[in-house]
């Protein structure tokens, strides 16, 4: 039989693994531990697409490899199952989001199992399970006790259509919501915040210890955004009021010609003159409709309004006008800036637009034409004149501190984490607000605070979550008769995913989040694979919670994930017209090797793009598994290119991977397997073991598969195959194509045991060199023969072999041999006359 039947083999082995608990996490204390973690998915209604298995296959290959190397392997899977889509679906259909979520999880699990991943399902977690979110709530109560969870009246990104506020990170650059693309408006609301800023310095510094892609570390550094500079206090003319600005360039204070406050700044209404009151009020309203991202877009037109008030520049006593402008955010820094238009592009554009004074304080450039943003000696700066940047900053900070009008200051771009959502489908926040004005956390003995089941999950309309409608759940009375009201906000989806990797370590513990000894044994996670889109949010939040738990003594390590790897994106086949617009695949036909728009007849260019329903180019893994088999999908996704590259899906590539597996099947089913080693495959076999082992360590799965192909080609040229090499090859194949490998192992090793824990093959360094070499035989300097001989023969042995060769014998039959020159491993030159 020339091909194998994947429809028979794959379900057979999946059933075997499940029945035998083959992938139960090892607990042998004499073995090293290896923790391979996937970013767990949100179980959407659409199910898996072929992008999901790329990362999952990578961790699965490593897990199977490490088991064979004698490690205890923790390789778990779970569900990040709270979130807006389930709630939106429930509102649209009237169904319970819990039912919808359970159906989706069952479908995801079916699809994942069909791909042959070696998960330990005894450790499955689900963020919506009360036994799980009991500990999410417990972490929150600890944050609350330590003052790191607090309530504040803050301007939030309110999305009317979603009935909830969303975090800054969930607002797109165009000012719409990441989920749904709805308009986002700013409005002040009582919100729960987590004080992630208390950990800013540690979150920044500890990045140095991590084996993460530098690009991800840079994104976190930029998000944390550490700046060293000075706070400067400006008094407001004719009042007893003042405001503080933070600047990284206090040395340019002599060039500050106006100040700008955020429209939401507390002083705006106090200092605005009667003449400017209406203009200021109108501007404040307009600013409230924009997201932070839209307001700070560098490309947008500069807008602003003068308040009618003046500030006093502390260094020279000059009166400078105070404006409001939406590019200054109340939530960033002090909500006020000093503007030095000569040396800042945004300030320069603003000054030009509103005809404000521009005074150069650094030499170089022509500030009439553009802001000069390079460095140079100070000018127009009194006691700083002639100094360079570093010396001038130091001198100005000393002056500010001496005069009592400023001080050195470190600030961070990082804001505290907006932690509440006005939705139903999330973890209830375990806080009770009492009528006497106090608030307390729900005691640990009463956790979990279970989300009540209700059919009425529409937003309350008051800005509170639907939980505000459930009075039986909402209202509580203390033993002393004081009445209270439960917190109605729920936690964001990020909560459950900030610590799930800890629960996998001890998922059934009812007494604590996880056992200390087990945490010590498994942390930090050895390899975490997932999409780069989680660079800032999830990874930063998880690091914050981990550090907090480290401070509590709950976890033994400072960081959760030692090595992080981002797989690339699998792109779909798509087509562009002459305008660059994408055309859905069902509107395209292929003629004579070219592609055409069925409706317009226009020839189209093939161009990979992100898979999407609208382009009708989403590939469902169910279809691939049915037609080609799970092993083919696994091998193809690992062979299509480097794991971190984004590559277009190709049906031809898929067929190529299947053909390779069929060749493997034929080789091991038709070739005579022998117990005596002829030595013919020594070099290629040992090279293959060495190469595949090294490439697995480096996550270079495509080159590992290429080496397996080299071995198959070499083995096919031989009449017989040494059985030990056949077995070793099957072991090397097993992490990539586990079903086929199990089937072949049974036949070749003549066993009914799984291959999963068979010791990984080793290679012999001495076999990596050629046993034979090709030498040339020359007569009078001309090549007359090429001979394959044993390596490292002596000069005498080479001479003997050359002179005994039939062809050479006939060439020199009637000639006298004058001299024979032999060079070992290279040539024999025969001089005749």
Curated annotation (Swiss-Prot):
One of its GO terms (molecular function) is aminoacyl-tRNA deacylase activity. It comes from the Bacteria. The keyword Nucleotide-binding applies. GO terms for biological process: leucyl-tRNA aminoacylation. Its main location: cytoplasm. It is found in: Cytoplasm. A motif ('HIGH' region) lies at residues 41-52. This is Leucine--tRNA ligase. It comes from Streptococcus gordonii (strain Challis / ATCC 35105 / BCRC 15272 / CH1 / DL1 / V288).
């Amino acid at each position: 039989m020339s091909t194998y039947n994947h429809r028979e083999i794959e379900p057979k082995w999946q059933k075997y693994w499940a029945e035998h608990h083959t992938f139960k996490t090892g607990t042998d204390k004499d073995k090293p531990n290896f923790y391979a973690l996937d970013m767990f998915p949100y179980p959407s209604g659409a199910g898996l697409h072929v992008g999901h298995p790329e990362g999952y296959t990578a961790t699965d290959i490593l897990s199977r490899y490490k088991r064979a190397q004698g490690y205890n392997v923790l390789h778990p899977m779970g569900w990040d199952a709270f979130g807006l889509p389930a709630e939106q679906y429930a509102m649209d259909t009237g169904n319970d989001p819990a039912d919808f979520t359970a159906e989706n999880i069952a479908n995801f699990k079916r699809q994942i199992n069909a791909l042959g991943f070696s998960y330990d399902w005894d450790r499955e977690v689900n963020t919506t399970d009360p036994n799980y979110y009991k500990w999410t709530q417990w972490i929150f109560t600890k944050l609350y006790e330590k003052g790191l969870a607090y309530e504040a009246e803050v301007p939030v990104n309110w999305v009317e259509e979603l009935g909830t506020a969303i975090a800054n990170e969930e607002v797109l650059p165009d000012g719409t919501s990441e989920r749904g693309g709805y308009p986002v408006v700013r409005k002040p609301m009582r919100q729960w915040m987590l004080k992630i800023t208390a950990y800013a310095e540690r979150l920044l510094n500890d990045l140095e210890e991590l084996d993460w892609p530098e690009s991800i570390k840079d994104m976190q550094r930029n998000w944390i955004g550490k700046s060293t500079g000075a706070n400067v206090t400006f008094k407001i003319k004719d009042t007893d009021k003042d405001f503080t600005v933070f600047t990284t360039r206090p040395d340019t204070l002599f060039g500050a010609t106006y100040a700008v406050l955020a429209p939401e700044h507390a002083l705006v209404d106090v200092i605005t003159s009667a003449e400017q009151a209406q203009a200021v009020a109108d501007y404040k309203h307009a600013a409230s409709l924009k997201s932070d991202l839209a307001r700070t877009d560098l490309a947008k037109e500069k807008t602003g309004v003068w308040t009618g008030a003046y500030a006093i520049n502390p260094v020279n006593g000059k009166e400078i006008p105070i404006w409001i402008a939406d590019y200054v955010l109340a939530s960033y820094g002090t909500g006020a800036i000093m503007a030095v238009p000569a040396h800042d592009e945004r300030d320069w554009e603003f000054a030009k637009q509103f005809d404000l004074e521009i005074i150069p304080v650094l030499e170089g450039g022509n500030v009439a034409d553009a802001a000069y943003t390079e460095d140079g000696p100070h000018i127009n700066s009194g006691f700083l004149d002639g100094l360079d940047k570093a010396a001038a900053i130091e001198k100005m900070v000393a002056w500010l501190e001496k005069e009592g009008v400023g001080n050195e200051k470190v600030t961070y771009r990082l804001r505290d984490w907006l932690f509440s959502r006005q939705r139903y489908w999330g973890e209830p926040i375990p806080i009770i607000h009492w009528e006497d004005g106090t608030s307390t956390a729900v005691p640990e003995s009463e956790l979990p605070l279970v989300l009540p089941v209700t059919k009425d999950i529409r937003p309350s309309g008051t800005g509170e979550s639907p939980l505000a409608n459930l009075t039986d759940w909402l209202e509580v009375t203390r033993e002393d008769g004081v009445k209270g009201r439960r917190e109605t906000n729920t936690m964001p989806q990020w909560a459950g995913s900030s610590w799930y990797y800890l629960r996998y370590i001890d998922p059934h513990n009812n007494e604590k989040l996880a056992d200390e000894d087990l945490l010590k044994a498994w942390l930090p996670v050895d390899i975490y694979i997932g999409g780069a889109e989680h660079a800032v949010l999830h990874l930063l939040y998880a690091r914050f919670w981990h550090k907090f738990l480290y401070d509590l003594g709950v976890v033994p390590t400072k960081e959760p994930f030692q090595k992080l790897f981002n797989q690339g994106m699998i792109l779909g086949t798509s087509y562009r017209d002459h305008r660059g617009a994408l055309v859905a695949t069902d509107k395209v036909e292929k003629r004579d090797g070219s592609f055409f728009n069925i409706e317009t007849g226009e020839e189209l260019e093939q161009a990979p793009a992100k898979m999407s329903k609208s382009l009708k180019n989403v590939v469902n893994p169910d279809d691939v598994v049915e037609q080609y088999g799970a092993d083919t999908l696994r091998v193809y996704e690992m062979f299509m290119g480097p794991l971190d590259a984004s590559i277009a899906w190709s049906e031809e590539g898929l067929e190529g991977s299947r053909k390779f597996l069929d060749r493997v099947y034929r080789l091991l089913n038709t070739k005579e397997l022998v117990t005596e080693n002829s030595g013919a495959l020594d070099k290629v076999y040992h090279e293959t073991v060495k190469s595949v082992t090294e490439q697995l360590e480096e996550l270079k799965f495509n080159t590992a598969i290429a080496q397996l192909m080299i071995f198959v080609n070499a083995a096919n040229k031989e009449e017989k195959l040494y059985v030990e090499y056949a077995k070793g090859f099957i072991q090397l194949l097993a992490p990539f194509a586990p079903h086929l490998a199990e089937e072949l192992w049974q036949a070749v090793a003549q066993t009914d045991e799984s291959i999963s824990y068979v010791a990984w093959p080793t290679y012999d360094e001495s076999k990596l060199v050629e046993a034979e070499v090709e030498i040339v035989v020359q007569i009078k300097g001309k090549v007359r023969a090429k001979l394959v001989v044993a390596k490292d023969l002596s000069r005498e042995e080479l001479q003997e072999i050359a002179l005994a060769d039939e062809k050479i014998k006939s060439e020199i039959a009637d000639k006298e041999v004058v001299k024979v020159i032999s060079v070992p491993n290279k040539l024999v030159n025969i001089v005749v006359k």
